[in-house]
From Swiss-Prot:
Keywords: Hydrolase, Magnesium, Metal-binding, Nucleotide metabolism. SUPFAM superfamilies: dUTPase-like (SSF51283). This is Deoxyuridine 5'-triphosphate nucleotidohydrolase. Pathway: Pyrimidine metabolism; dUMP biosynthesis; dUMP from dCTP (dUTP route): step 2/2. It catalyses: dUTP + H2O = dUMP + diphosphate + H(+). The keyword Membrane does not apply. GO terms for molecular function: dUTP diphosphatase activity; magnesium ion binding. This enzyme is involved in nucleotide metabolism: it produces dUMP, the immediate precursor of thymidine nucleotides and it decreases the intracellular concentration of dUTP so that uracil cannot be incorporated into DNA. Gene3D superfamilies: 2.70.40.10. NCBIfam families: dut, PRK00601.1.
């Protein structure tokens, strides 16, 4: 199946000019890696969070959003994840893309300039029009109001 492609404007800021643009690691990758545009290395201690610059600004087209997600290897091997995962970048945002990382391990972790720290997906979004009703859908769904843990282990 052929994936659709969209053009997204991107600009490297002065502190990110030497870094790679976000890119797919493999042909079938869903997300593109984002790089740390830190001037100096930073140590992320256990349970600390850090807003890491990427050195880029992007112009996401209307009808799309950017989703910032953790890199699975960083999370599994080092406990480093994106705090507000997935982070949402709205199509009208024009500031620098920054990543809010947190260290959930019990060991300090050093983030160096150029490290791949997260991934970004550009995805279509719908805009909701609420249908406010006094009588709510009474149709049985099998789940109904069952919430957390209701579908079993």
């Amino acid at each position: 199946m052929q994936r659709s492609k969209i053009k997204v404007e991107i600009k490297r800021l002065s502190h990110g000019e030497d870094l790679s643009l976000p890119c797919y690691a493999t042909v079938q990758s869903a997300g593109m890696d984002l790089y740390a545009a830190l001037n100096d290395s930073a140590v992320l201690n256990p349970l600390e969070r850090l807003l890491v610059p990427t050195g880029i600004v992007i112009a996401i087209p209307n009808g799309f959003e950017g989703q910032v997600r953790p890199r699975s290897g960083l999370a599994a091997k080092h406990g480093i994840t994106v705090l507000n995962s997935p982070g949402t970048i709205d199509s009208d945002y024009r500031g620098e893309v920054k990543i809010c990382l947190i260290n959930l391990s019990n060991q300090p972790y050093e983030i160096k300039r150029g490290d791949r720290i997260a991934q970004i997906l550009i995805s279509p979004v719908s805009q909701v029009i609420w249908d406010d009703r006094e009588e709510f859908c009474a149709e049985e769904t099998g789940r109904n109001a069952g919430g957390f843990g209701s579908s079993g282990r």
